[in-house]
């Protein structure tokens, strides 16, 4: 029933967006044709002075290009919304009912251990790890995931800032470790350091920039990449990154050490000793070498976080079986575990689950994993 309601709402929204976009254009055209869309946006409407082009000479209309133009014209925003709504409809709203197994009446995703090079689990048929939570349509889809019946509720147990905690632990950076030990908002704490202001004077835009840098550093973000994401000059982005490393010197030392060690060994390791071969780190090709260096930085962090949650899953599964619990672990979404929780077991099981998640893999330098939990009548409400 909820799926039918979502399907109708999404179809109505897509139709409304289609009509509005074509009114802006002043004529009918195929919204799904990059060539036609580019010609209207940049050839006819001339929304940008010097629009980017592909190697074949067509105007670029990919998500990154259009996202960088968001707010310049209502049509751009509506096209981005149209694309997201269309993707959600085809990927989830229309497709999920086809994945319901007749014998159980449930959707059963497939997990793969050898798809992501860092060791993260991947989900397919259907992919339940990629349902957006920041959009209204994505939230509606999450509402469709409910417990098995009366007496049950959904429990979401989510590692808090796990990759940044792993980076603090592996780098041994005193400032970052201190922020976590004091249970500070790490993005607010980083903003206070980078902008040299007291914690209570950090503005929302400062925190937003710090958040982008915190996560970007894990993936080896460049000054150019940060400037593109924040819409600021490259020189300003470079200054922010440099200040970040001045405030967190242990992070820079860790990254330099990891790259040097990987060049020497040809591989990088997670906290559990799981290795990823990175022979390209000594390549004479700058682009290939750069990609390998970013992987060398990211793999120990993301890979150790992946090891942590998989070890937690093993411990929790064994615990639930031994306890004869009616509660079942039903889904893993990177840093989150979802349970079909029997209400009578909530008081005993939730603390036990949290403890096993926190203790699954001891982190160096006194850094502790933190787990946030929530329950609800559906997956959305559990957050």
What are these regions (language model features)?
Residues 139, 152-153, 162, 326-328, ...:
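Gly/His-enriched, cation/cofactor- and phosphate-binding structural elements
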Residues 11, 15, 26, 42, ...:
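Hydrophobic alpha-helix feature that most strongly marks membrane-spanning transmembrane helices
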């Amino acid at each position: 029933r909820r799926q039918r309601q979502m399907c109708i709402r999404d179809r109505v929204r897509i139709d409304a967006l289609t009509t509005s976009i074509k009114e802006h254009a002043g004529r009918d055209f195929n919204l799904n044709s990059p060539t036609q869309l580019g010609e209207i946006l940049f050839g006819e409407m001339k929304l940008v002075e010097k629009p980017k082009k592909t190697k074949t000479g067509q105007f670029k209309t990919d998500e990154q290009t259009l996202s960088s133009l968001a707010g310049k014209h209502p049509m751009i925003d509506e096209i981005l919304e149209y694309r997201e709504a269309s993707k959600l409809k085809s990927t989830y709203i229309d497709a999920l009912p086809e994945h319901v197994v007749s014998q159980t009446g449930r959707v059963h995703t497939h997990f793969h251990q050898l798809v992501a090079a860092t060791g993260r689990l991947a989900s397919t048929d259907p992919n339940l790890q990629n349902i957006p939570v920041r959009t209204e349509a994505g939230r509606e889809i999450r509402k469709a995931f409910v417990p098995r019946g009366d007496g049950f509720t959904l429990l979401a147990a989510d590692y808090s800032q796990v990759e940044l905690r792993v980076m603090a632990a592996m780098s041994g950076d005193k400032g970052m470790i201190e922020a976590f030990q004091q249970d500070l908002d790490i993005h607010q704490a980083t903003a206070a350091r980078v902008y040299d202001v007291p914690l209570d004077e950090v503005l929302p835009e400062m925190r937003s920039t710090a958040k982008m840098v915190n996560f970007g550093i894990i993936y080896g973000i460049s000054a150019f990449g940060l400037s593109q994401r924040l819409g600021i000059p490259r020189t300003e982005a470079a200054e922010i990154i440099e200040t970040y490393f001045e405030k967190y010197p242990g992070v820079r030392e860790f990254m330099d050490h990891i790259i040097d060690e990987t060049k020497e060994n040809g591989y990088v390791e997670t906290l559990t000793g799981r290795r990823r071969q990175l022979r390209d780190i000594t390549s004479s090709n700058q682009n290939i070498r750069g990609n390998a260096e970013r992987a060398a930085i990211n793999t120990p962090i993301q890979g150790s976080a992946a090891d942590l949650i998989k070890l937690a899953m093993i411990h929790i599964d064994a615990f639930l079986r031994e306890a004869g619990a009616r509660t079942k672990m039903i889904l893993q979404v990177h840093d989150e575990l979802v349970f079909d929780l029997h209400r009578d077991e909530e008081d005993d099981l939730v603390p036990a689950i949290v403890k096993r998640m926190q203790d699954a893999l001891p982190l160096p330098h006194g850094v502790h994993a933190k787990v946030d939990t929530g329950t609800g009548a559906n997956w959305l409400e559990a957050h």
